[in-house]
């Protein structure tokens, strides 16, 4: 029998990330996985500290009304990003070495507000404002994606889903009813 490499994609320790979650790992055998429609996943890592993480977020339904300004929806997005960044810093990452890959933000339902574009725009603006370099990824479009991210190396793999994905559409929440949580204080920025 031929030995299998520890970081082989078929034998890695897979960790699924669902909407609203984030995860930070320093295990070279870990691979963070998610499925995205209009949601966005930010994959951040520090190559010097061999640590990385992924989040999976969707701006609440009132984001289209607040796209140009602050508001609760943008605070929710900033909170999701800061949770990931702060957790990376707690695990030894340095902010000045962080790299990013962004995925998702698809427009899955024609005729409705393109919440995927708003999610993608937000993620790009946030990282630019934080001075975190975006080195890759795949945003927008009309198809969902399956993402695998190796947090230690920063390697990522994307598989586009078939154009007709009714199961994925059912899994996405009704964007008109999803609302931002009420503000509960300031977000601590490092």
Curated annotation (Swiss-Prot):
InterPro entries reported for this sequence: CheD-like_sf, Chemorcpt_Glu_NH3ase_CheD, Cytotoxic_necrot_fac-like_cat
Root EC class: hydrolase
SUPFAM superfamilies hit by this protein: CNF1/YfiH-like putative cysteine hydrolases
Any one GO molecular function term: protein-glutamine glutaminase activity
Presence of keyword Hydrolase: yes
E.C. number(s) listed in UniProt: 3.5.1.44
Hydrolase found in the keyword field: yes
Transmembrane annotation, as ranges: none
Catalytic activity entry: L-glutaminyl-[protein] + H2O = L-glutamyl-[protein] + NH4(+)
A biological-process GO annotation: chemotaxis
Pfam families (alphabetical): CheD (PF03975)
Domain of life: Bacteria
Gene3D superfamilies: 3.30.1330.200
HAMAP family: CheD
Cited function: Probably deamidates glutamine residues to glutamate on methyl-accepting chemotaxis receptors (MCPs), playing an important role in chemotaxis.
Similarity comment text for this entry: Belongs to the CheD family.
Protein name per Swiss-Prot or TrEMBL: Probable chemoreceptor glutamine deamidase CheD
Organism of this sequence: Acidiphilium cryptum (strain JF-5)
């Amino acid at each position: 029998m031929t030995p299998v490499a520890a970081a082989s994609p078929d034998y890695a320790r897979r960790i699924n990330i669902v909407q609203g979650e984030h995860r930070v790992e320093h295990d070279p055998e870990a691979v963070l996985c998610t499925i995205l429609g209009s949601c966005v996943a930010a994959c951040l890592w520090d190559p010097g500290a061999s640590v990385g993480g992924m989040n999976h977020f969707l701006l609440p339904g009132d984001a289209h009304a607040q796209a140009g300004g602050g508001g609760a929806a943008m605070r929710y997005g900033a909170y999701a990003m800061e949770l990931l960044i702060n957790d990376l810093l707690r695990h030894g990452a340095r902010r000045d070495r962080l790299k990013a890959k962004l995925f998702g933000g698809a427009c899955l339902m024609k005729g409705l507000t393109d919440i995927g574009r708003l999610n993608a725009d937000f993620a790009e603006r946030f990282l630019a404002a934080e001075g975190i370099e975006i080195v890759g990824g795949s945003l927008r479009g009309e198809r969902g994606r399956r993402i695998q991210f190796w947090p230690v190396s920063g390697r990522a793999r994307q598989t586009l889903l078939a154009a007709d994905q009714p199961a994925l559409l059912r899994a996405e929440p009704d964007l008109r009813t999803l609302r931002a949580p009420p503000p509960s204080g300031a977000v601590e920025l490092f």
